[in-house]
Amino acid sequence: MKDGKHPNPNTIHPIAGYDKEIYVKPTITNPNIIVGDFTYIADSDFESHVSHLYEWNDDKLIIGKFCQIAAGVEFVMNGANHQMNAVSTFPFYTLEGWEMSPPAKTDLPLKGDTVIKNDVWIGQNSVILPGVHIGDGAIIGANSVVGSDVPPYTKVVGNPARAIQKRFDDELIELLLRFKWWDRSIDEINRLIPILTCSDLDKVKAEIKKQLG
């Protein structure tokens, strides 16, 4: 509890006086966008950063809890992809007046849902391409274009985005993936903040092992 207030995932503006910083979940209107508690974006309109999410493609954008999405980040969905196994890439079937029925979905470059797990930091002006899966705790460097999956607790940068290093050693990554702090109650997370913000990784390992029993 801070200033007499309890964290509330249904609050839209978590920082008083800053309209360009919002918790995303309570603002969502599109049923094909699913966002977890306390994920925020540095903008006043999250859905304007999701493009080509057409109902006929049936794909979803799924984002976990406690993600941090910087200004200018764009999520490009499957509707942006064009058929590349035919002579022309022009999407006749999507535009009015052209005599073409939609091709079979097996002929379209559909890559499935885009999934961002929990506690992911996406840097400013990055682009997340269709069907990408980004693991828990990953960091996406600013101006990156992410077209392939990102393992948990991995830093990626560039266009196309490439992994530059794991954030922690394998033991700590495995502990964090088992611990799943983001799924715990608000009161428990509050008590865990000294560990979640600690840079003494040996101490963090010891405490998580203790918590896991």
Where are these regions (language model features)?
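Domain-scale signature associated with acetyltransferase and cell-envelope carbohydrate enzymes
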Residues: 1-119, 126, 161, 170-213
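Outer-envelope exported proteins of Gram-negative bacteria
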Residues: 64-66, 137, 141-143
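Beta-rich strand-turn-strand
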Residues: 110, 125-138, 146-148
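Short glycine-rich donor-binding/catalytic loop of glycosyltransferases
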Residues: 132, 143-144, 149-150, 161, ...
